[in-house]
């Protein structure tokens, strides 16, 4: 069983990592190709392309200029410790033990516009490049064309290494934007997508902030409980969520909570 997550826009490179162990991204050459393309953009181009402020555009143009194919402790940080958004608040990787991080390294993958797919302990240099960005490139009009089958092929390879655990299942805890880079016809696995709904206004609905955090919390649950069989995820009961069998089907597992009447 392998879990995929989305990355985060917010990054933390100020807090020193509490662990030194790391691995390197496996698509560095492909990332370098994207960086070369991004370096051709002026700040105003980046602001328009990514719909961000001029200040953020300047920051990211600087990041592209500083990016190096040589990853070091001075310019990089482990991905799972560098990302700093709602999903990663739920995952709370900084409090995971060394053994927890080792399990996460085998069972969690982070989809990335720049890096394709990252393992939790892969060193990562700071960047902003969302998967849905329409950055034209030699392969086509966007990043889905750029990555093609490569991300899915690497996920297949990683899952094959877990075959001894018994379940060739990909648990999709990523957003729709990011999971679109995974190609179903190439993927050699069953896909389960957990969905988190909260009671509000007289009905259950997905509330983005809560759903993002819950995805990270479920990933943490899988790590700390050493989950290798997806059926074990039905026991997930953190923060008041519970599996709702009636609202679920084989591919879409719904978890609901009711904090208000």
Swiss-Prot record:
Gene Ontology terms describing biological process: response to hydroperoxide
Highest taxon, organism lineage: Bacteria
GO cellular component, one term: cytosol
InterPro entries, A to Z: YaaA
A Pfam family per the record: H2O2_YaaD
HAMAP family with a match to the protein in the record: UPF0246
PANTHER family, alphabetized: PEROXIDE STRESS RESISTANCE PROTEIN YAAA, PEROXIDE STRESS RESPONSE PROTEIN YAAA
Family according to the record: Belongs to the UPF0246 family.
Name this polypeptide is given: UPF0246 protein Rmet_0978
Organism: Cupriavidus metallidurans (strain ATCC 43123 / DSM 2839 / NBRC 102507 / CH34) (Ralstonia metallidurans)
């Amino acid at each position: 069983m392998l879990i995929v997550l989305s990355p985060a826009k917010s990054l933390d490179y100020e807090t020193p990592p509490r662990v030194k162990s790391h691995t390197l991204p496996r698509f560095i050459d492909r990332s370098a190709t994207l960086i070369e393309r991004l370096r051709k953009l002026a700040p105003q181009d980046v602001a328009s392309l990514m719909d961000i402020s001029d200040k953020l555009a300047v920051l990211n143009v600087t990041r592209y200029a500083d990016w190096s194919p040589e990853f070091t402790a001075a310019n990089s940080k482990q991905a799972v410790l560098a990302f700093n958004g709602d999903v990663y608040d739920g995952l709370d990787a900084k409090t995971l033990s060394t053994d927890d991080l080792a399990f996460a390294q085998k069972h969690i993958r982070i989809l990335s516009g720049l890096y394709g797919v990252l393992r939790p302990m892969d060193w990562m240099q700071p960047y902003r490049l969302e998967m849905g960005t329409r950055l034209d490139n030699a392969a086509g009009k966007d990043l889905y064309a750029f990555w093609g089958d490569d991300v899915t092929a690497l996920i297949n390879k990683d899952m094959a290494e877990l075959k001894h655990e018994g379940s060739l299942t990909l648990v999709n805890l990523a957003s729709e934007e990011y999971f679109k880079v995974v190609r179903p016809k190439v993927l050699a696995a069953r896909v389960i997508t957990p969905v988190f709904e909260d009671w509000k206004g007289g009905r259950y609905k997905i509330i983005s902030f809560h759903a993002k955090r819950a995805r990270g919390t479920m990933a943490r649950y899988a790590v700390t409980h050493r989950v290798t069989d997806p059926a074990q995820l039905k026991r997930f009961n953190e923060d008041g969520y519970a599996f709702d069998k009636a609202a679920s089907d084989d591919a879409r597992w719904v978890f609901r909570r009711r904090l208000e009447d």
